[in-house]
A protein has these predicted regions:
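C-terminal lobe and adjacent flexible extensions of AdoMet/dcAdoMet transferase-like proteins
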Residues: 216-254
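A short glycine-rich, Lys/Arg-flanked "PGG" loop and its adjoining helix->strand segment in the class I
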Residues: 131-143
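A short SAM/SAH-binding and catalytic strip from SAM-dependent methyltransferases
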Residues: 112-128
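SAM-dependent methyltransferase
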Residues: 148-221
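A short acidic, Gly/Pro-enriched loop at the edge of an enzyme's catalytic core
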Residues: 104-113
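Class I SAM-dependent methyltransferase SAM/SAH-binding core
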Residues: 56-102
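Conserved class I S-adenosyl-L-methionine
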Residues: 1-53
Length: 254
């Protein structure tokens, strides 16, 4: 993906920190059954996990009986996911396709659900690429299928930039990124670019990611422009809108 910052990919430092940054069991506790319940409510069987990462969601759903196809562009994360799958005694079905070209590899209406979780669309910096990706997700979804996608509350980053860069960064640690051994802080906040630093407690091991900060309602507008008619928004997995939420999750119907 040419529009993705090269330094975001194949970083062993970030991949090695990731398990302690997420904490799989606490992530599941934080979502309180949200993902499984949402898929079951919408009678989902086949799932395209567009951002495999270390396998947290794909492995969980495979163990829950869903038919999962996983995708990732990062070779180091794929290795880590395969390692985790072996530990959990499940077999991953992995592809490494460019999101913007999914229609070349999958037929229209191939999946009941597409997942783009873990704040992953933020790796794309250009609106054209963001929109094209969402349209590709729409294309490979079956009629009445759902896209489940999330984003960090970047409006907070942008509004409180000065305080955050002084070291006063607010994050509950209860949702999505729940580990206590690895911490992440913004070290640069610009209009169209945020740099996050990930480090262990002793700061001996560090890694950075460069991310696009979606403004409030920006992703929601892109989802509508991509063709999704019914878009439900959740704040930290709760229905009401909370301007101080850590994460926003969208369930979008084709």
């Amino acid at each position: 993906m040419s529009s993705i910052v090269a330094e975001n990919y194949n970083s062993k430092a970030v991949v090695n920190l990731w398990p302690d940054f997420i904490d799989w069991s606490k992530r599941r506790q934080g979502e309180n059954g949200f993902l499984k319940k949402t898929l079951e409510k919408n009678k989902v069987n086949s799932v395209f996990d567009s951002c495999l990462g270390d396998g947290c969601d794909s492995i969980y759903l495979l163990k829950e009986g869903f038919d999962v196809t996983s995708n990732d562009f990062d070779l180091e994360f794929i290795k880590k996911a395969q390692e985790n799958a072996r530990k959990e005694n499940v077999k991953l079905n992995i592809s490494s396709f460019d999101w913007r070209e999914l229609g070349r590899h999958y037929d229209k209406e191939s999946f009941d659900a597409v997942l783009c979780l873990g704040n992953s669309l933020t790796y794309l910096f250009c609106k054209k690429d963001q929109l094209n990706t969402l349209r590709q997700f729409y294309k490979i979804l079956k009629k009445d299928g759902i896209l489940v996608i999330d984003e960090r509350n970047y409006q907070y980053f942008l509004d409180e930039k000065d305080e955050i860069l002084k070291g006063n960064f607010r994050y509950s640690g209860k949702f999505v990124y729940c580990g206590k051994k690895v911490h992440a802080y913004p070290i640069k906040i610009e209009k169209n670019r945020v740099v996050m630093e990930y480090s262990d407690k002793n700061k001996k091991n560090k890694g950075n990611l460069v991310l696009y900060p979606f403004r409030r309602n920006e992703m929601k507008k892109l989802l509508a422009e991509a063709g999704f008619k019914k878009i439900q928004q959740f704040s930290d997995y709760k229905k009401e809108f909370n301007p101080d939420a850590d994460f926003y999750i969208y369930v979008c119907r084709k």
